Amino acid sequence: MKQESSLLAKLANGSLVLQILLGIAAGVILASFSQDAAKQVAFLGSLFVGALKAIAPILVFILVASSIANQKKNTQTNMRPIVVLYLFGTFAAALTAVVLSSIFPTNLVLVAGIEGTSPPQGIGEVINTLLFKLVDNPVNALMTGNYIGILAWGVGLGLALHHANDSTKQVFADMSHGISQMVRFIIRLAPIGIFGLVAATFAETGFAAIAGYAQLLAVLLSAMAIIALIVNPLIVYVKIKRNPYPLVLRCLRESGVTAFFTRSSAANIPVNMALCEKLNLNKDTYSVSIPLGATINMGGAAITITVLTLAAVHTLGIQVDLPTALLLSVVAAVSACGASGVAGGSLLLIPLACSLFGISNDIAMQVVAVGFIIGVIQDAAETALNSSTDVIFTAAACEAAENKAKLG
């Protein structure tokens, strides 16, 4: 009995990253030997993602309300520089995708469009959807995982409770601590969940279906790698004036890996919150910036929209001049920030970008169909970039503020 408990203690206190890597390897091996067995363990991945998605809305709501209600007067939250970093990073991602797509133009083999999908008719519709999400019923926002609405109501409740009795504030602080403990337990189950996700993905696709889109994937993944390993570190260096790679690589390892396999920014919010706590960041800052980042920090989505749109443009033989390319970068960045306000995310915003070049909706929807074919890898890489960048920029802004205060 004692031996069993010591084994469980070792598993509970062991390196989570190492356990996740073992889970990935085990999933690949199982799918290679038996696809049927791999499909049988798919429920482990679904359970893990379901648990994260279930806890994330209430975690965000309570953390935001608690941190604002318990905020001391004259406390710096550093939100403005973080939002600026989010928006600049998204635009830089779109610009990188434009440059890479120009150097390596890609031809698409267009397939049938996706039936039953209705892309937004313009940027106005995307903004309209976001505004209505802002004033969603708070209970409905929690039930549907509408993080824009959850943030709005959490901030509102926090401000309302700012002048409440200390005992009331303490209740929210205790609830916040309790939910954080539950999140830690769920995150410890990541190796089992990722084992199920990897096994199911390899068993169902085998990645054979996406082999024909190798160049398109290469351009997409290269753009994301450039942002993750060159542009983001450069932005962080400008902010903190020291080697950015220890921070960047840690965030990619501890946030990006999980996000890659869950393929959900919402499901990765608890993981990012736990990482921010490990990095000793200001709780008042990250409790707001992380869920906000899951909504508006969409560098990966900007890359997807830009690369697929320019692939369609090149396939149709349309010439792109520099001003149009810059305009596409702006439209892709703004659209990407609204990706959370569109069912289907970044892929269904492609017709919006295609309309800049006079590409018909029928052809644009065929481009979306290509996006769905490569979606297994594209969506995973996009989420990993988006989610890890949330922590990177939050940490950079917090450290820059601390350095400024020391020089003070």
Swiss-Prot record:
Catalyzed chemical reaction(s): L-serine(in) + Na(+)(in) = L-serine(out) + Na(+)(out); L-threonine(in) + Na(+)(in) = L-threonine(out) + Na(+)(out)
Similarity section: Belongs to the dicarboxylate/amino acid:cation symporter (DAACS) (TC 2.A.23) family.
Membrane topology type: Multi-pass membrane protein
PANTHER family the record matches: PROTON/GLUTAMATE-ASPARTATE SYMPORTER (PTHR42865), SERINE_THREONINE TRANSPORTER SSTT (PTHR42865:SF8)
Database matches in HAMAP family: Ser_Thr_transp_SstT
Function comment: Involved in the import of serine and threonine into the cell, with the concomitant import of sodium (symport system).
A family per Pfam: SDF
Keywords of this entry: Amino-acid transport, Cell inner membrane, Cell membrane, Membrane, Symport, Transmembrane, Transmembrane helix, Transport
Protein name: Serine/threonine transporter SstT
TM region(s), chain numbering: 11-31, 43-63, 81-101, 141-161, 192-212, 216-236, 298-318, 330-350, 357-377
InterPro entries assigned: Na-dicarboxylate_symporter, Na:dicarbo_symporter_sf, Ser_Thr_transp_SstT
Encoding gene, per UniProt annotation: sstT
Cellular compartment(s): Cell inner membrane
GO molecular function, one term: neutral L-amino acid:sodium symporter activity
Source organism, top-level taxon: Bacteria
GO (cellular component) term, any one: plasma membrane
GO biological process, one term: threonine transport
Gene3D superfamilies according to UniProt: Sodium:dicarboxylate symporter
